[in-house]
Amino acid sequence: MVLHYTPHQSAPRNTTFVAEILDLDYQGRGVAKVQGKTWFIENALPQEKVEVRIVDEKRHYGHGISCKILTPHPDRQSAKCAYYAQCGGCQSQHIPIDMQRQAKQQALFQRLQQLQPQATFMPMIVAAPWHYRRRVRLSVRFHPKSKQLAMGLRQRNTQQIVNLQHCDVLEIPLSQLLPKLHLLFSTWSLPKNLGHVELVHADNGIAMLLRHTGNLAQTDRTLLTNFAQQENLMLFVQDDQQITQLHGEAPYYILRDGTKLQFDIRDFIQVNAVVNQKMIDTALEWLELTSNDNVLDLFCGMGNFTLPISRQVNQVVGIEGVGEMVEKAKRNAEQNQCDNVQFYQANLDQPFVQQHWASQHFNKILLDPPRTGAAFALHALCELGAEKILYVSCNPATLVRDTAILLQFNYRLKKVAMIDMFPNTGHLESISLFEKE
């Protein structure tokens, strides 16, 4: 979750204060109460006494960073990554992984239990806390005065770039590629034209996209192509107009059931492959799919849930707002010989009950909306009268809001599980099953 803070209009009298930390929120921030005001403090754990530097302050709450740990928690740990103090990629490496997960789970479950006390809270869906990211976007910036080039992630709370030679949350092949990229760009003829690099570890190798401004010099194109051949990369370049593939094939990943999902370098895919598979398995299990089911998959993308569902049901219809993704989903269905699947483009923030696909009978529905949630679609969705709705969420705030809406339409929250898709960060995802009463 990205939080945009607006500084308080009047500067505080003191820029630091001492606080005792009472709790931990799901984003890994310590929570303190000082003179009736709630403070959310980075790099602080429960039971600690810390000196806090104020980042911003509102009337009823404020944000700060602990600049000195006066009384440390006995379980506080040293960060695994040497860049952790500066890099904005992770927020929670000082917190033991069990404590991270407990805080995330408690925050989600407390909110939902207030709405549906009878809901069953299932074990968390987890995987390894390190080397799990199969995708990363790296900023690249050349400093003309120093003649130095930086490549990495943004520094915490600034726009500066942390120059990364490795990353402990990236899958190992991606992390191992970082120093080689630094070496490549050190010989670049026009480094000021470099924009960013995207890396994706697909099941058929690493795909790389280089974003640049202006024309790519022939010497740089040759360097880049030779590098891609040497490292066996699928290579793409993007200028101000288009993306061009210079080497390799299209990237894809394969699910446990053999479903092969091909995607383009800029397409959204779940960054944690292991957790993605567990999430799919959980969705299929909770929906209790049978060969008689007709399933509707909303916000379906290129078919990450749709195609595995199709192997167990009578028919599945996938709805996606982006036309290009619909075409890719159709292509994936054809390549996987899934002939009981239909995909349609629809803007789900507009009424859709009159669209022809909505006139079909669906007894089960899956939706995986963006961070803004699905409040705009839930009224029409509930009118379809499905017996089960499975909701995959990447934002606890919109999940709680949408749960309240579903309860108003006589759906009951039966069970929910937290998904630790991004260990050592403040991100929280979940999967929830609703049943018609």
From Swiss-Prot:
EC number: 2.1.1.190
Keyword hit for ATP-binding: no
Record protein name field: 23S rRNA (uracil(1939)-C(5))-methyltransferase RlmD
Keywords from the named record: 4Fe-4S, Iron, Iron-sulfur, Metal-binding, Methyltransferase, rRNA processing, S-adenosyl-L-methionine, Transferase
Naturally occurring in which organism (per UniProt): Pasteurella multocida (strain Pm70)
Purpose of the protein: Catalyzes the formation of 5-methyl-uridine at position 1939 (m5U1939) in 23S rRNA.
Signal peptide: none
Any one Pfam family match given in the protein's UniProt record, by short name: TRAM
Gene Ontology MF terms: 4 iron, 4 sulfur cluster binding; iron ion binding; RNA binding; rRNA (uridine-C5-)-methyltransferase activity
CDD domains cross-referenced by the UniProt entry: AdoMet_MTases (cd02440)
Residues covered by the TRAM domain: 10-68
Catalysed reaction equations from the record: uridine(1939) in 23S rRNA + S-adenosyl-L-methionine = 5-methyluridine(1939) in 23S rRNA + S-adenosyl-L-homocysteine + H(+)
Residues given in the record as [4Fe-4S] cluster binding sites: C81, C87, C90, C167
Alphabetical list of SUPFAM superfamilies matching this protein: Nucleic acid-binding proteins, S-adenosyl-L-methionine-dependent methyltransferases
Enzyme class: transferase
GO BP: any one term: rRNA base methylation
Positions with a binding annotation for S-adenosyl-L-methionine: Q270, F299, N304, E320, N347, D368
